[in-house]
Amino acid sequence: MHRTHHCAQLTTSQLGATVSLLGWVDTIRDQGGIIFVDLRDRKGITQIQLEPHENAKLAEQVKQLKPESVIGITGKVVRRPAGTENPALPTGEVEVVASSLEIHNISDTPPFPLDDAGGDKVNEDLRLTYRYLDLRRPKMRKNLQVRHRAAKSIRDYFDAQEFIEVETPALFKSTPEGAREYLVPSRIHPGQFYALSQSPQQFKQILMVAGVEKYFQIARCFRDEDLRADRQMEFTQVDVEASFVTREDIYALFEGMLKKVWKDVLDVDIPTPFPRMAFHDAMNRYGVDKPDVRFALELADFSELFKNSAFKVFQSTVAGGGVVKALNAKGLADLTQGELKSMEDTAKSLGAKGLAFIKVEGGEWKSPIVKFFTEPEKAELTKRLNIEEGDIIFFAAAPWEKACAILGRLRLESAAFLQKRGKLTIRHDDWQFLWVIDFPLMTYDEAENRYVATHHPFTAPVPDDTQYLDSDPKKVRGQHYDVVLNGMELGGGSIRIHQPVLQKKVFEDVLKIPQDVVESRFGYMLKAFTYGAPPHGGIAFGLDRMVALLCGTTSIRDVIAFPKTQKGQDLMAQSPTPVTPRQLKDLHIQTVMPE
């Protein structure tokens, strides 16, 4: 049988036409001997009318039909009787009276409902075990369509900007200073290993040396890391690099791409240019370097106010070089003991010894620490935090970054509690993009007693700060930038180091990587830079994460056709699996199980 139409195409304009449709049985209804089948394909649903009493062959076939069976029908398009139309369907004014039925496959009874409401109530592991059924649900089909449209929009945009798509190797060399890698043993080079590429970073920079000038790729990347709702061991990254560009060029390029994607996929016009916020400002105000600016609840610094405080915890923290910061969670004085305990546990998990707070109830400030506050201190707190009846004020006294992180997390939890009480509305489609810039180039690692690259070692320093590379690396800002949307990092990039002398200095003098290690891991790259490397920069962002936002889901597993679980398993194909002794022997490796 040859399909003449998709199920969603039939309207009153086809009345009287003979059509052939192919698809899955969505539902079956017997109404007084007349059988109605909702036939579904990837485009939509059409109602089919079967009259088995007029056709013996049809009668036998109808007896076999079960939901999710695959069939083909040929019949005439007719108008539905008055009063039986279905306005919820594009095809709701018509039905097809079948003259013939072809059964391609009879389905077993699915282990869970394949409608959105029923499927959403099912344990995710069951859905992933039967992923081929889960993907039949309307929501999941829509997610895959959104993903396709987003990827096409991205390709069209970069093609119009004269970028070329270049594939880079998935099999790379191990660079163990980053995230954990997936190692691939070499059969023909015993004892040696490839690593699955975590990012095309080095290859795309080499392409700039090669004169490509404008490169992009929708690349598969692999990282052996702990999995969360927004992480997968294999993921898709949109990777971009260009020569002879500044940060401003990258901002404009990427904003243009996002503007096109949001318009093409959602028909939403997002305003550009995006606001910009320095890293230090983001941490000070929101307690995180990827702030959700859809709601207020900003942090405030009171270190100067409390440097001579009678409350010794505050006074000693400031004297020791730390800070005292506060957050007014407006309207949350009604937090329960359980909710407060949860927030205290959060603070402790981030290094706090406890959680100091003040509730404002019945016109009083209620807290054991209030007795230490002078009237001028209370007046300053009231003025700057706009303290009112029903508020609760949280404090953090700690080194700057820790204090910011503690209150930043409590800010998000406060917003969640406010939403739960109906006191705050945060729309998922309130698209608040911004750039976070001026990150520190280096971060000091106390455990290793050395500086490490805040992002990666190829980021160029801000030219005015290069003078501090030797004397005070923590003062050096990197030419790095992150694009943030509603509290989620969409992507990040930087202007790169392109001078071999400076790159070698960063590796050896600042990061303290031994010279022989630099040569073995990055020697080819440094060599390439000696042959006329142009100034260059770029950006990369997770396609999975962006599509999840476009679809309004919190898990990227919902927008990947065949994702792994949070334990890194493919429940459908049942991987990973053991391999045979012969396979291990061929690869010159053996397994040693943990005790």
From Swiss-Prot:
PROSITE patterns documented for this protein: AA_TRNA_LIGASE_II
Top-level class of the enzyme under EC nomenclature: ligase
UniProt xrefs under SUPFAM superfamilies: Class II aaRS and biotin synthetases, GAD domain-like, Nucleic acid-binding proteins
Reactions mediated catalytically: tRNA(Asx) + L-aspartate + ATP = L-aspartyl-tRNA(Asx) + AMP + diphosphate
Site description Important for tRNA non-discrimination, residues in chain: 83
EC number annotated for this UniProt entry: 6.1.1.23
Cellular compartment(s): Cytoplasm
Positions with a binding annotation for ATP: 223-225, 232, 489, 542-545
Sequence positions that bind L-aspartate: 177, 223, 455, 496
Domain of life from the UniProt record: Bacteria
Pfam families: GAD, tRNA-synt_2, tRNA_anti-codon
GO cellular component: cytoplasm
Major location category of this protein: cytoplasm
A GO molecular function held by the record: ATP binding
GO BP annotations listed: aspartyl-tRNA aminoacylation
Region listing for Aspartate, in residue ranges: 201-204
Keywords in alphabetical order: Aminoacyl-tRNA synthetase, ATP-binding, Cytoplasm, Ligase, Nucleotide-binding, Protein biosynthesis
HAMAP family in alphabetical order: Asp_tRNA_synth_type1
PANTHER family: ASPARTATE--TRNA LIGASE, MITOCHONDRIAL, ASPARTYL/LYSYL-TRNA SYNTHETASE
Role this protein plays: Aspartyl-tRNA synthetase with relaxed tRNA specificity since it is able to aspartylate not only its cognate tRNA(Asp) but also tRNA(Asn). Reaction proceeds in two steps: L-aspartate is first activated by ATP to form Asp-AMP and then transferred to the acceptor end of tRNA(Asp/Asn).
Family: Belongs to the class-II aminoacyl-tRNA synthetase family. Type 1 subfamily.
Quaternary structure note: Homodimer.
Name of the molecule in the record: Aspartate--tRNA(Asp/Asn) ligase
Organism per entry: Opitutus terrae (strain DSM 11246 / JCM 15787 / PB90-1)
Lineage: Bacteria, Pseudomonadati, Verrucomicrobiota, Opitutia, Opitutales
Gene transcribed to yield this protein: aspS
